[in-house]
């Protein structure tokens, strides 16, 4: 069993997006996805969800009438997704090799998750290249990353581990997480994403933060009334593209045109 499988067997992805901070992420991401989806003839619009987890996005989009294909590496997650019987075509697979999916098949491709776990730039570029291969020319790709500063602040400083992690080489002198091969996550800064796009010759349409400060405000979100919480989601949608806030959340989504 891989480290990724061990992690997702223990930490249920199904539950994460049902928390209030997870609901912020989902609501904002879905708003941006819908900006590029048709309102008619939805059954003709093909969406690939690579790293689909237990199907939070796949199932929601399939229920709206879109033609959704989901690919998931973790067997436990895939079994949950398949059990939902929501007309989602499900495949076991790895974002680095989507050879079972034909070229230029999908109108949009969602890549939420795989890039979190790929430590080297060449592997990230391979995943992006595969996503581009299966996406039609002019189609959209939604690529999500984990952000460096969230980990530095919420883990390294908040848990008082920053000094030992710098000493061990896990954090650089300029406070960038340095992932070891056996670690689960990789964290990036905006300039890292820009460099990947330049290396891959990838065109960005826009970039946005799906969660903003939500992960830093879990207790506060949980104490909000339903009305106030809805207003917080409105706030994040309104501010998701603000340049001065992009790198401060825990996730970021790069919308690319193939």
Q: What residue spans do the PLM features occupy?
A:
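A short glycine-rich, Lys/Arg-flanked "PGG" loop and its adjoining helix->strand segment in the class I
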Residues: 125-137
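A short acidic, Gly/Pro-enriched loop at the edge of an enzyme's catalytic core
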Residues: 99-109
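A C-terminal cap/extension of S-adenosyl-L-methionine-dependent methyltransferases
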Residues: 206-258
